[in-house]
């Protein structure tokens, strides 16, 4: 079987994006489903570090960039989209929640993906000043090459200062959350995340099917975290975990699910399948 070449970006659109990135003082990249393919995280990590581009993994389905990357600014978009002058959306159907977040009305918004406007969605109301169709990793690699030819942006130092402040704030929030959680008689999600992070190994695969404090988990390697896809629906986590264990029998799989998600995942047949096929998974059920 001869596989077709993946779609690449339109040169004119890529040049337009290159201009906007060079001129942006407060750009931000928001990823949702990016990181599925091998090499995706390396491509984005290289782009972000070489060209001073902050990255947010908002409600991520995969790890788009290592969690310890110097340009990773966390998992929430609120304050960042409010101040950004350029928002680059990569493989994300909902880069922010309009009822909770108010982007800068003067910001340019760019959507990147195989179908950047998600044309099969009945309704989707997010602004778009530029849509670039193509396999996202190829678009980002093309942007990297185009920016390298231009030379550094005059705003690199300003971007670095913004990122340093964002990362320091995220660390402070995480420390306070864990300290507060440690004093409570019942476990809360920050405490569960803190304990899970201390117990898991670098090769463990973690599935989350609930709103979870991702900033308290370390994922320095790509392909170690899997979050709920909009195509899944409630109950996806158990089946996903079984599939991951089947594909990776030598790696530990940890599923973190809410009690409702657990029940919708048909736990009785799920655990019977695990037993019958010798596919042990660790399931953490959160009463949320």
Predicted features by range, described:
Residues 30-31, 55-58, 89-90, 132-134, ...:
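General beta-strand structural signal in soluble alpha/beta enzymes
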Residues 38-58, 201-204:
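Redox- and metal-dependent alpha/beta enzyme cores, enriched for Fe-S-associated oxidoreductases
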Residues 57-163:
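Glycine-rich, acidic loop regions that bind phosphate or pyrophosphate groups
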Residues 83-95, 213-288:
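Thiamine diphosphate
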